């Protein structure tokens, strides 16, 4: 049995899944648009 695979790191989390990261690419903006359309309270990490 190995180590737990989830190693929390807020900096990495924001850098990869944060709002600014989403806005930086065309597909990321599509993600936000879908989540807005769905009515998600939280759009990104």
Curated annotation (Swiss-Prot):
Top-level division of the source organism's lineage: Bacteria
Basic residues compositional bias, start-end: 10-20, 27-45
GO biological process: translation
MF-aspect GO terms: structural constituent of ribosome
InterPro entries for this protein: Ribosomal_bL34 (IPR000271), Ribosomal_bL34_CS (IPR020939)
Chain residue ranges for the region called Disordered: 1-45
Alphabetic keyword roster: Ribonucleoprotein, Ribosomal protein
Pfam families according to UniProt: Ribosomal_L34 (PF00468)
Keyword Ribosomal protein attached: yes
GO cellular component, one term: ribonucleoprotein complex
Keyword Ribonucleoprotein: yes
Family (UniProt): Belongs to the bacterial ribosomal protein bL34 family.
NCBIfam families in the cross-refs: rpmH_bact
Protein's name according to its UniProt entry: Large ribosomal subunit protein bL34
Organism: Shouchella clausii (strain KSM-K16) (Alkalihalobacillus clausii)
